[in-house]
Amino acid sequence: MNQENASCPKKHFFGPASSRITVKGTIYPIEVGMRRVALTRSYECKGERFDAMPLYDTSGPFGDAEREHDVRKGLEPVRDRWGFDRGTVESVGGELSMTGRKPRVAKAGEAVTQMHFARKGIVTPEMEYVAIRENQALEAWIEKCGGKPVTPEMVRSEVARGRAIIPANINHPEIEPMIIGRNFRVKINANIGNSALGSSIDEEVEKAVWSCRWGADTVMDLSTGKNIHQTREWILRNSPVPIGTVPLYQALEKVGGKAEELSWEVYRDTLVEQAEQGVDYFTIHSGILAATLPDAEARQTGIVSRGGSIMARWCRAHKQENFLFTRFDDICDILRSYDVAISLGDALRPGSIGDANDAAQFGELKTLGELTLRAWKRDVQVMIEGPGHVPLHMIRENMEMQLKHCHEAPFYTLGPLVTDVAAGYDHVNSAIGGTLIASLGCSMLCYVTPKEHLGLPNRDDVREGVIVHRVAAHAADIAKGSATAWLRDELMSKARYAFAWEDQFSLALDPLKTRQIHAQNIAATGDTSATAKYCTMCGPDFCSMKRSQETTAAGL
């Protein structure tokens, strides 16, 4: 492993005003990581003065320039220090390859899921952690704006109801817990993973770390090439965010890539293998049924889900029902033993706007709702995956149908992409649809990169995809009435009007790019960020804000 490729902390990565801070819990000995931005002046908002802004931070130790980190050793197992006695866990099997820790599993017949404890009325350390994290140390501000801060009890209630999930496998002690649900901050997921045509373990670990640093709340390893197990191990041991996978991909590799040779036994063993490593959620395509295949195969673009196409091939070859459906209860029994959440895959999502909202898509959605209830009976956490390609005016129906059929389980969508002609710019295309559906209640957006439909993304593509979808999620949070999201914009506006460039850089979603663009343009004028009372878009003589200030100062 090349340590230099691991995105190790660099001084002032987020800017000189940014630092990593922690907030202590009151129920458990937890320390919740956040980022604090010091401002160059004090700004007034609703009668309150702010000389700093605490920010939600997904970067973990990688965002702390004061700490050294060696990816060859992995992150510290912070959850192991919280002292929560699950009481029903035992160690099994051999040692994990990087850490020497033995995998843990619930004793026979027991459950260790967040939903299980929530339904018993127990607030776990993870629940307290996400409550503190969602508030961003701004409880007083939230109340001043007429809102209610998130409490551990509220988190417990939402998880017990199934309206939110905390993906946190008991074998992934390195993560900083987060929550996915419509009553919380909108989250984003970044997909990484090798293919048969390229990428290495080093590159995928770096992309995972890079995703966390720029704002991805979860990461999915969708590797389909060589060294799937080893790649996943390196990613898990170095990930402060939950990791998801599609176990079907590795199961397919085990049978030489031949879908017809897949079996429940191969798939079951793959689930256990990945659960023991620490994967936090699985995408499982249990909703594609033999009866729905004719509708899907008659579409303009057929079945565009990789997992969906694999299981369709298996069903056709064996003339049997999808074993991910028929063995669903067995799947849940495995997952409840490790607290792996299920992301019910949309195997029949539309791959073109002409196929949006058709019988195949919504037929599968109804099946996913039925499976949700079956998973909940076993205290397994569930979220529902959604489309896909959907024109803007048809997006609202997707959210309404999901709420109707899936019992308010969190919705997790790929976009939606609102047009089919944006190749090279599909990250923007996805963010347009994502902003709308998130404002309507979607809990998490899966990012799309500029390489979508074209090729395997590199590190720079990952950054671009994460930031663009972070913009979409933030815009949706504002539309939903988030007081913390609104405050960040309020402070940015005041900094902009005051020509406080350093504060603008610090408050931006991409401080590095913001600073670079301004520095490149202002250098030609002879001014600096410290002195310029204008930007090069308008220049010193045509700056509207500068003129407005001069007019006000003159009493005109």
From Swiss-Prot:
Query: What EC designation does it have?
Result: 4.1.99.17
Q: How is the cofactor bound?
A: Binds 1 [4Fe-4S] cluster per subunit. The cluster is coordinated with 3 cysteines and an exchangeable S-adenosyl-L-methionine.
Molecular functions per Gene Ontology: 4 iron, 4 sulfur cluster binding; carbon-carbon lyase activity; zinc ion binding
Binding-site positions, Zn(2+): H389, H453
Would the keyword Iron turn up in this protein's UniProt record? yes
The answer on whether this UniProt entry bears the keyword Transit peptide reads no
Instruction: Name the positions where substrate binds.
Output: N191, M220, Y249, H285, S305, R306, G307, D346, A347, L348, R349, E385, Y412
One Gene Ontology cellular component annotation held by this UniProt entry = cytosol
> Catalytic activity, per the record?
5-amino-1-(5-phospho-beta-D-ribosyl)imidazole + S-adenosyl-L-methionine = 4-amino-2-methyl-5-(phosphooxymethyl)pyrimidine + CO + 5'-deoxyadenosine + formate + L-methionine + 3 H(+)
Provide the family line.
Answer: Belongs to the ThiC family.
Tell me the protein's name: Phosphomethylpyrimidine synthase
Q: Which organism is it from?
A: Chlorobaculum tepidum (strain ATCC 49652 / DSM 12025 / NBRC 103806 / TLS)
Q: What is the lineage of its organism?
A: Bacteria, Pseudomonadati, Chlorobiota, Chlorobiia, Chlorobiales
